[in-house]
Amino acid sequence: MAAAKITFWGAAGQVTGSMHLLEAAGARILLDAGLFQGKRKESAELNREVPFDARRIDGVVLSHAHIDHAGRLPLLVNRGFHGPIHATAATRDLCAVMLADSAHIQEKDFEYLQRHDRAGPESEPLYTMRDAARTQELIVGVPYRRLQHLRKNVTLEFTDAGHILGSASVDLRITEGTPHRLVFSGDIGRTGLPIIRDPNPPAGPVDTLIIESTYAEREHETVLGAEERLGEIIRRVASRGGKVLVPAFAVGRTQELVYALNELFRNGKIPRIPVYIDSPLAIEATTVFRLHPDIFDQTERLVESDSPLFDFSLVNYTRDVEDSKKLNTLRGPAVIIAASGMVEAGRILHHIKNHGDDHRNCILFVGFQGEHTLGRRIQEGDETVRIFGEERTIRAEIETISGYSAHADRNELRSWVRRIGGPIRRAFCVHGEESALAAMAEILKSEGVPEVHVPRHGESFDLV
């Protein structure tokens, strides 16, 4: 291979903001372009930074639609990027929902600040709905396991990452000069979860591996154990007249929870209490899920049993603001599932503000809570938090179920590496907090990878 290098512009030394720039075979290819989340001032500054000329990027390869992987794509378009964005068809369809929602929220927040004379340059939207629409026009749907030529000497193949609908691991082969194979794991999912197929890594020798590390130091409970705990928590909270408030990612986690609640109800393991999906984005995303049953894990069984995947008698989808507001004064037991998953935005903030001070209620975390997020602070026991500028006391019970995580744990990450099968010459650990990155590096070294790096933000490496 002729001179080539990789530069890590996001999810390097932290979880969010995934973006890696590959320069090889005369091309400049981005792997992901995600938003940073967490410390608000720091994240806002990083999100406005485009540390290269977007007009000179030849293309983007997108692993999946989560906003910390796709959320800066419209910003690149705003800054002059006009090349193709390669993603699976399901990721393309989810991006139509996710990116428009991201732009809409930014525009509405800015309008609110303008009305209250609090708007400054730092509060201007990163991009607009028009930028999101222009971005959507650039996305090319690529089927799993189909070879796609990005350039004369660069090919792409997607394999199932098992993280969310449409998620992919990226297999790039560079044939200019000495052949070089680069594999980017994307976010690796769990094995044995319903709906989404299990992770299926690219097989064979790898020259360069870029691998996520989110839960490299932890072990999750089993899926069966998670379902049993979910049922037990709902029964306990309902028996005292309380509500279960679940912050959940609109794409992936919400659909899995609805599926699990359906199973629990059908098997008589939870009482007949209402379940509210209070997330317009989740409702739109669920529509996209219904468009892609061909990539579900359990399609055949579900069709045979005539089981509705995302609908059952207890579920209520709240589509407008007025229906959502009615939940603020809701009496009696209920389950309320709302975005955002890390309690940084969305309708879950209203529900915790209105119901978080009642000891009968429970705030149930079922997904990763990033450093410095409101979700992490509540999860770790902060009794007083600020929501919409007001101090609020948290008296609700706090519970966490790790079995619904969409990220592989340390054993599943090790298994994924082993299933590659061939030797791995070099690896980079990304998408993790410091302790998780160190743990992932140790896993790779113990599996015989001779060269392992934990890159810092903006750090470049030659690939030779």
Q: Where do the language-model regions lie?
A:
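Gly/Ser/Thr-rich loops at beta-strand to alpha-helix junctions
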Residues: 13, 66-68, 164-165, 249-256, ...
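Cap/insert and terminal regions of metallo-dependent hydrolase folds
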Residues: 169, 189-278, 362-367, 385-451
